[in-house]
Amino acid sequence: MDLSLFSDIKDVVERDMKKNSKVVENSSARSLKNKTEENKTIDKHKSSVGPKEPKSSLEKPKANRKRKQSYGLLHDIKELGGTEEDLELIEDVESDEELEFEEPNRKQPKKDGTDAFANELNLFAKKLGFSKNSFDARALDTESEDETEIEKSSSENSDSVDVDSDDE
């Protein structure tokens, strides 16, 4: 059996351990202190036996969710090369999911679109300062009829007009 394979693995493990110890040394004393305090409180909670004070059912899920969320964030931050201090910076920031948006009060459009259009056109006419205070919807109807008549006559004229070629 070749023992050189095991020595290579041992060297890799030792290098990884040195890298991890350097990361711990580079982190601030404050973050190490917080980490040790968290470990102590976790150990106290694990070792405590006996009746616990009842907590409301609403507080427990929020606390667990917050803890899981911060652990997940801490894990992601560390993967990106950050530290626990970076987690503290973003701890109070709310995500988009937590923000509540209020829907603006919008007027529901009327079932009959022509009434709404006529009202908007009436307001537009008032803003432009026309002498009439209200828009006459009948004018809209006659205008559209005039346009269709013009279109019909122009299409008839274009069909009846012969274009002479340069054969003469």
Swiss-Prot record:
Compositional bias ranges of the Basic and acidic residues kind: 34-62, 103-114
Record GO cellular component, one term: nucleus
GO biological process: ribosome biogenesis
The entry's keywords: Nucleus
Superkingdom of the organism of origin: Eukaryota
Intrachain disulfide bonds: none
Biased composition (Acidic residues): 82-102, 159-168
Chain positions covered by the region annotation Disordered: 21-114, 136-168
Subcellular location: Nucleus
Protein's name according to its UniProt entry: Uncharacterized protein C589.03c
Source organism: Schizosaccharomyces pombe (strain 972 / ATCC 24843)
